[in-house]
Amino acid sequence: MNKIIEKMIYESRWLLFPVYIGLSFGFILLTLKFFHEIIQFLPKIFDMPESDLILIVLSMIDIALVGGLLVMVMFSGYENFILKMSDDCNQKRLNWMGKMDVNSIKNKVASSIVAISSVHLLRIFMEADRTRDNKIMWCVIIHLAFVLSAFGMAYIDKMSKTKS
């Protein structure tokens, strides 16, 4: 009976596969949005103020950071939880693949969230004259919560490695 339960639990990892396929679809949508942003502002590039251009570039950076986060979660999650990718399938293997454990992934995700939040906060500061003070305050508080969480997770990870 135990063997059957263990096998069921082990094989249930494949339920994550459609999730990673869904993330791939999300990445495709994000890429489409990125190019939509470029196509939308290209005709206006010479008429727009520099501050608007900076906001558009910040939006593109935001999309790139989220895309990088998606790729990292898809690859490392697939390799850690479903199946190791074979070397013959991908000749140009990313150097971090196969080297990230769950804690490393969590720390990278937390760092990425802080970076994304920083870009979002910078965009809000650039539009401060059009943004309510209350919204700015809450965005700063939420950003600080992300930063503290990232530091806390990194500290806990470091402490658990020194005890081992």
UniProtKB/Swiss-Prot annotation:
It comes from the Bacteria. It is found in: Cell membrane. It holds the Pfam family UPF0114. Keywords: Cell membrane, Membrane, Transmembrane, Transmembrane helix. Its main location: membrane. GO terms for cellular component: plasma membrane. InterPro entries: UPF0114, UPF0114_bac. Belongs to the UPF0114 family. HAMAP family: UPF0114. This is UPF0114 protein BCI_0033. It comes from Baumannia cicadellinicola subsp. Homalodisca coagulata. The lineage of its organism: Bacteria, Pseudomonadati, Pseudomonadota, Gammaproteobacteria, Candidatus Palibaumannia.
